[in-house]
Amino acid sequence: MDLTVKTLEGKDAGKVSLSDAIFGLEPREDIIARVVRWQLAKRQQGTHKAKGRAEVARTGAKMYKQKGTGRARHHSARAPQFRGGGKAHGPVVRSHAHDLPKKVRALGLRHALSAKLKAEEIIVLDDLVANEAKTKALAGAFASLGLTNALIIGGAEIENNFKLAAQNIPNVDVLPVQGINVYDILRRGKLVLSKAAVEALEERFK
């Protein structure tokens, strides 16, 4: 499929052909959901912790004698049913990460790119270069292109002025092409690719 290439000023700068093997798949939500779940589980901190009955600071002595009180036969006040006792089966510090085959991850990225193209939410820019590191000027250029909520993917290196100017614009993320991922594609409205990013993606999935 051919898309018109735009400049930051909003002018046309030719056309680019997008590969059907990357951008032309019928999006499968199940594969995309698997990749997003894998990404979010991998970044989860996992530092949750509740003290069990062996860890709470409380006496280990028997609460009261075994017989003669008419009450239930309790021993430790650390048992979960008591106020101040340990939590039964509480959260422990652990990693939430799980495995996902590389082929499924790659397929998920292609399906996410295809979903964006199908929704007509991909814009290809000629180059990501700013003359000066001024947020106001770049924000104006983005507004004229309709980029109020966007993920911008550049080549292997993002030009420094562009990176500095873009980092204070709300709801706009800028990543090099090697950082492209399914979750960030889906959480932003528009996906903006530089010509270098398109070439790198086609080389990657060749």
UniProtKB/Swiss-Prot annotation:
Residues 64-77 have a biased composition (Basic residues). One of its GO terms (cellular component) is ribonucleoprotein complex. Keywords: Ribonucleoprotein, Ribosomal protein, RNA-binding, rRNA-binding. HAMAP family: Ribosomal_uL4_B. It holds the Pfam family Ribosomal_L4. Belongs to the universal ribosomal protein uL4 family. The keyword RNA-binding applies. This is Large ribosomal subunit protein uL4. It comes from Sinorhizobium fredii (strain NBRC 101917 / NGR234). Part of the 50S ribosomal subunit. GO terms for molecular function: rRNA binding; structural constituent of ribosome. One of the primary rRNA binding proteins, this protein initially binds near the 5'-end of the 23S rRNA. It is important during the early stages of 50S assembly. It makes multiple contacts with different domains of the 23S rRNA in the assembled 50S subunit and ribosome. Forms part of the polypeptide exit tunnel. PANTHER family: 50S RIBOSOMAL PROTEIN L4 (PTHR10746), LARGE RIBOSOMAL SUBUNIT PROTEIN UL4M (PTHR10746:SF6). Residues 63-93 are annotated as: Disordered. Gene3D superfamilies: 3.40.1370.10. One of its GO terms (biological process) is translation.
